[in-house]
């Protein structure tokens, strides 16, 4: 077999490796989530008792980055162990480090002066885990239950996609409030600027994938569609909702999502089209990306509603915690009903209402735990430097992680990499992203 034949065979093997998966259990998603929360709690414990370690890059990287990496690789079958081992090691460290002076000075709950510490920890954890997963999924050490599902079910990577949209919705509320005095045309111009940047990124990814014959997964978004195109349409879609107040815009979005869901349930021909239609034109070729946009809109709008709780940032931490607890219980109850009694299963491929509900409820639970640990159980909020850096330049970090993933796949045969080699590559990759986030001299804003 010639070189081109070997490359084509490897491409098909890689495509098969990420195809046909059915997802993981709710318990698996819970355990990975808790591993990340416990890792950050361990870092907070160390720097609270040993202020000299607060600026330590290696402590930050070991607990916050390697903790997340290990939870989806070497401890992937039991990610809860990552958090437990991290906390145990830190408690032991605390017992033998009794000479350090504990900080007691009370600080504001703001991070970088314009955002709560909770939001910084939440967004950066989500971005780091997402960036790790998009490369780790190409290695056998990454459990297949965490890879994106084919059609029905939910996995860690499915949750990550929705979480990215949800977190963008939260932050968009701040821009929404700051732009209340802008004219309609000024808002449209602002939205178009964001859209153009993301469309350009989408086309760069599309052409690069086609040009180098990179592995593709058509049922993820379609033949030509990708996640950047979905993100690019959200600012434009939100222009329609600018005519309504916050609560009404969410209600309108929810009605649209319910109508879409009813079409999936009561119009078998529509569902059959989404599942089985030949890809003969632009719409049929990209139907996953086009029709799932309705679900991502409701996730984005829900994020805006939650953002209204965090901005302005002068709210009482405990008051905010109880609001998050109430919303978490309510959204979890809805998700439970949809998961167990709804006739249509959860589907990220079509962004069903069950999927949207799961994404919203999980993110609310994560925000609740982060609020509790970061701002309510400590004398003052503490945020790792790498978290602040990732949060402040999230889109650029996400873009670089996509580019680096492609470079790694062309450099190494990830599919046949043994565990030790996979962990070495992934550790260097995570280290590169952490250093890049800290040292990059500019920000990608739109």
From Swiss-Prot:
* Organism domain of life: Eukaryota
Q: Which Pfam families match?
A: GWT1
* Family stated for the protein in its record: Belongs to the PIGW family.
> Which cysteines are cross-linked by disulfides?
none
Key words of the record: Acyltransferase, Endoplasmic reticulum, Glycoprotein, GPI-anchor biosynthesis, Membrane, Transferase, Transmembrane, Transmembrane helix
Protein name listed in UniProt: GPI-anchored wall transfer protein 1
Q: What does this protein do?
A: Probable acetyltransferase, which acetylates the inositol ring of phosphatidylinositol during biosynthesis of GPI-anchor.
Give the UniProt subcellular location, in the record's own words.
Endoplasmic reticulum membrane
Uppermost EC category:
transferase
The transmembrane residues are: 32-52, 56-75, 76-94, 122-142, 151-171, 194-214, 221-241, 250-270, 293-313, 320-340, 350-370, 395-415, 422-442
What are the EC numbers? 2.3.-.-
Tell me what topology the record assigns in the membrane: Multi-pass membrane protein
- What InterPro entries does this protein's entry cite? PIGW/GWT1
GO MF entries: glucosaminyl-phosphatidylinositol O-acyltransferase activity
Q: In which pathway does it act?
A: Glycolipid biosynthesis; glycosylphosphatidylinositol-anchor biosynthesis
PANTHER family reported for this sequence:
PHOSPHATIDYLINOSITOL-GLYCAN BIOSYNTHESIS CLASS W PROTEIN
UniProt GO cellular component terms: endoplasmic reticulum membrane
């Amino acid at each position: 077999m010639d070189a081109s034949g070997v490359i084509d065979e490897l491409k098909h093997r890689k495509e098969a490796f990420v195809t046909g998966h059915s997802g993981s259990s709710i318990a698996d998603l819970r355990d990975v989530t808790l591993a990340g929360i416990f890792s950050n709690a361990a870092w907070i414990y160390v720097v609270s008792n040993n202020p000299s370690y607060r600026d330590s890059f290696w402590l930050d990287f070991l607990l916050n980055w390697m903790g997340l990496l290990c939870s989806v690789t070497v401890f992937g079958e039991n990610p809860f162990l990552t958090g437990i081992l991290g906390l145990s090691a830190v408690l032991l460290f605390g017992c033998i480090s009794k000479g350090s002076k504990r900080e007691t000075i009370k600080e504001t709950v703001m991070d970088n002066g314009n955002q709560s510490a909770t939001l910084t920890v939440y967004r950066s954890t989500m971005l780091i885990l997402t960036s790790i997963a998009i490369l780790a999924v190409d290695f056998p050490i990454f459990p297949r239950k965490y890879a994106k599902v084919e059609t029905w079910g939910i996995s860690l990577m499915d949750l990550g996609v929705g979480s990215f949209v949800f977190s963008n919705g939260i932050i968009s509320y701040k821009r929404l409030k700051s732009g209340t005095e802008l004219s309609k045309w000024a808002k449209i111009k602002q939205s178009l600027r964001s859209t153009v940047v993301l469309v350009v990124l989408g086309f760069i990814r599309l052409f690069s994938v086609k040009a180098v014959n990179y592995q593709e997964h058509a049922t993820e978004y379609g033949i030509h569609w990708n996640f950047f195109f979905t993100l690019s349409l959200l600012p434009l879609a939100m222009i329609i909702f600018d005519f309504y107040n916050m609560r009404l815009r969410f209600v309108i979005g929810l009605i649209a999502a319910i109508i879409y869901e009813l079409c999936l349930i009561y119009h078998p021909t529509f569902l059959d089209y989404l599942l089985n239609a030949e890809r003969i034109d632009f719409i049929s070729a990209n139907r996953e990306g086009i029709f799932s946009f309705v679900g991502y809109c409701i996730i984005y709008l829900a994020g805006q509603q939650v953002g209204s709780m965090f901005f302005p940032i002068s709210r009482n931490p405990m008051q905010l915690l109880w609001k998050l607890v109430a919303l978490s219980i309510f959204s979890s109850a809805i998700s439970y009903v949809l998961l167990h009694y709804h006739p249509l299963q959860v589907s990220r491929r079509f962004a069903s209402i069950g999927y949207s509900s799961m994404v919203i409820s999980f993110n609310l639970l994560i925000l609740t735990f982060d609020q509790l640990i970061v701002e309510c159980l400590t004398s003052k909020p503490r945020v790792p430097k790498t978290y602040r850096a990732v949060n402040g330049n999230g889109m650029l970090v996400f873009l670089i992680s996509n580019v680096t993933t492609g470079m790694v796949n062309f450099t190494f045969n990830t599919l046949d990499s043994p565990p030790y080699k996979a962990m070495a590559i992934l550790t260097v990759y995570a280290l590169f992203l952490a250093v890049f986030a800290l040292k990059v001299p500019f920000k990608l804003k739109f």
